[in-house]
């Protein structure tokens, strides 16, 4: 631990020696961070795209006068005049205004071709707008959108299972705000768990994924929740053929919150028909954050999705679902070093019974507690070093009873540790 702190101190100290422009890019209407915004110095072409936190760093700048250009699709171009002094760093947070994109004359200009060093193959970023525009069954669905992408197949027309480049559906790593979701589907795989109005972005990596991801063979789907509107309170609701949905959001102490929920209503429509089992499912997805200081952010994410089936005629009862809870702390140690710390818990369970309390009952449970630390060190304008570690405490429980008699019980509690370092 002592050596680790020494390394952090050295990185922080080294990061303070060069001329740097750094900061966060956000949406002016809501305060949400903009991922992938382009930040470039007009005179030199130096710049980068913002990371998952909306953070950017431009280094090794020669003293002089510059124009900083910030652009993002759907937002107006922002230009800032800057004067750079030797050895002096500038922290500049910029909020972009939304703009209607007009199709007009396109003028393409270019200077000397530069080497593209940050290309990642097989990576696709999906926005809520793309999810809502894609064909879907009953209502917009993230997994249905992904199934329309190249290299992605499905097991059947009625399944949201993702078969990516020949892998099985259980070989994909599904993450929601850094937390593993073990069974992200409802109604036997017909609908996915995630509420589109509560999703900020979904990143699909179909192969050659980065060192920080592990534990699966096929692909990675990293889902990021919306952060909420920091400027004002607002809400919306809609009704589809499948469910009723609502989303509320608003400002919180130096931050924002958002709450999304949905529930199907088939059980209410057919409750007078004894031949149709009263089945329903619901999802609740929320996120809240607070910028405690300009360098520190604390956030909390929660998800709960349950399927419930009760068919009294045959004594059949079933209940299964997922629940995740995560706490994240982000710290900007210096212009060049940013760290993210995570504590998370993920639970997946199934409960099935046939014949009531005197019949056959089966319970299955996966409990995942995770602690992780990830760092990004912007070493230079040409390279970024990412490193981190993760510890998982897993619990697997499977029991089967017949009446009051325990048929069998299987319980294991393995642990996993992983660390990584990569140069980008």
Give names to the regions the model predicted.
Residues 289-306, 319-424:
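Face-selective signature of the C-terminal outer-membrane beta-barrel domain
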Residues 26-30, 37-42, 71-75, 85-135, ...:
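Short, acidic, small-residue-rich periplasmic hinge/interaction motif at the N-terminus
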Residues 229-231, 251-322, 350-351:
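Periplasmic-side early beta-strands and strand-to-turn transitions of outer-membrane beta-barrels
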Residues 57-60, 133, 179-206, 274-279:
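Short acidic/polar hinge/loop motifs at secondary-structure boundaries
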Residues 134-137, 143-183, 200:
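Extracytoplasmic beta-strand/coil segments of soluble accessory domains associated
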Residues 90-94, 142-145, 160-162, 189-195, ...:
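N-terminal periplasmic accessory domains that precede
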Residues 44-55:
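Short, acidic Ser/Thr/Gly-rich low-complexity loop/linker segments typical of extracellular
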Residues 160, 217-219, 233-235, 242-246, ...:
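Hydrophobic, lipid-facing positions within transmembrane beta-strands of outer-membrane proteins
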């Amino acid at each position: 631990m002592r050596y680790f702190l020494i390394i952090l101190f050295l990185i922080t100290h080294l990061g303070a020696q060069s001329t740097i422009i750094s900061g966060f890019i956000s949406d002016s209407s809501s305060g949400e961070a903009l991922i992938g915004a382009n930040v470039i110095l007009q005179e030199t072409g130096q710049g980068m795209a913002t990371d998952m936190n909306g953070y950017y760093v431009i280094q090794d700048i020669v003293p002089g006068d510059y124009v900083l250009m910030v652009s993002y699709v759907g937002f107006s171009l922002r230009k800032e005049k800057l004067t750079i002094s030797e050895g002096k760093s500038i922290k500049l947070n910029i909020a972009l205004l939304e703009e209607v994109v007009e199709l007009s004359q396109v003028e393409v200009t270019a200077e000397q071709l530069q080497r593209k060093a940050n290309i990642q193959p097989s990576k696709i970023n999906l926005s809520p707008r793309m999810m809502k525009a894609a064909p879907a069954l009953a209502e917009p669905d993230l997994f249905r959108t992904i199934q329309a992408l190249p290299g992605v197949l499905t097991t059947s027309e009625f399944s949201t299972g993702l078969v990516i480049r020949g892998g099985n559906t259980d070989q994909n790593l599904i993450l929601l705000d850094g937390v593993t979701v073990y069974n992200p589907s409802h109604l036997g795989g017909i609908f996915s768990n995630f509420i589109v109005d509560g999703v900020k972005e979904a990143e699909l990596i179909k192969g050659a994924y980065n060192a920080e991801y592990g534990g699966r063979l096929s692909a990675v789907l990293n889902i990021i929740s919306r952060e909420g509107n920091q400027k004002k309170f607002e809400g919306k609701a809609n009704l589809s053929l499948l469910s009723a949905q609502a989303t509320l959001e608003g400002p919180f102490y130096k931050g924002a919150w958002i709450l999304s929920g949905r529930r199907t209503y088939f059980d209410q429509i057919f409750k007078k028909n004894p031949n149709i089992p009263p089945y329903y499912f619901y999802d609740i997805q929320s996120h809240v954050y607070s910028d405690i200081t300009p360098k520190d952010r604390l956030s909390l994410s929660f998800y709960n999705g349950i399927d419930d089936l009760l068919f009294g005629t045959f004594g059949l009862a079933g209940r299964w679902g997922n629940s995740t809870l995560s706490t994240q702390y982000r710290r900007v140690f210096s212009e060049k070093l940013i760290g993210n710390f995570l504590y998370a818990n993920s639970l997946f369970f199934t409960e099935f019974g046939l014949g009531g309390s005197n019949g056959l009952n089966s319970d299955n449970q996966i409990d995942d507690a995770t602690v992780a630390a990830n760092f990004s060190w912007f070493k230079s304008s040409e390279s970024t070093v990412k490193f981190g570690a993760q510890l998982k405490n897993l619990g697997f429980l499977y029991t089967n009873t017949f009446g009051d008699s325990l048929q069998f019980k299987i319980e294991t509690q393995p642990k996993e540790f992983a660390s990584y370092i990569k140069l980008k």
